[in-house]
């Protein structure tokens, strides 16, 4: 039963070509896909991902992103993503929570967050708000 489930997880994540490799020999991105596979094996429906894009090449990041989106849509997984890559956040997250100094600064859609003055000021400085207002 476990072997059958593992085979399904490996297929879902397109990792069949790596089944003979030791985890220690995998690249950073491949290890992150393997971590997703581990969550699938225990059927963890709520998953915390910390800097999923860090140290991962764009090709593997696309594979990881697609796997996260599929797990959310097809298997009803919920992901909490801690990430600084805003492009990645825009692809993965329906709701974005921005924190500053340990407190929630703003919560909303990606588009709402990226245009929120408090967020812009906290992360880019007041000059960016003035520049954005001049360009509007």
Where are these regions (language model features)?
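H-loop/switch region of ABC-family ATPase nucleotide-binding domains
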Residues: 83-84
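Conserved ABC ATPase "signature" region
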Residues: 1-18, 66-69
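Catalytic Walker B motif of ABC-type/P-loop ATPase nucleotide-binding domains
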Residues: 47-50
């Amino acid at each position: 039963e476990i072997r059958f489930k593992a085979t399904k997880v490996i297929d879902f994540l397109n990792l069949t070509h790596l089944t003979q490799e030791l985890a220690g020999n995998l690249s950073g991105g491949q290890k992150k896909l393997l971590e997703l596979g581990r969550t699938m094996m225990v059927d963890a429906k709520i998953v915390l991902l910390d800097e999923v894009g860090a140290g991962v090449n764009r090709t593997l990041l696309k594979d990881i992103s697609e796997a996260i989106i599929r797990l959310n849509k097809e298997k009803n997984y919920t992901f909490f993503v801690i990430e600084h890559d805003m492009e990645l956040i825009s692809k993965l997250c329906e709701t974005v929570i921005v924190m500053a100094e340990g407190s929630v600064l703003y919560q909303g859609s990606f588009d709402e967050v990226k245009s929120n003055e408090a967020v812009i000021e906290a992360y880019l400085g007041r000059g960016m708000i003035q520049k954005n207002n001049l360009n509007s």
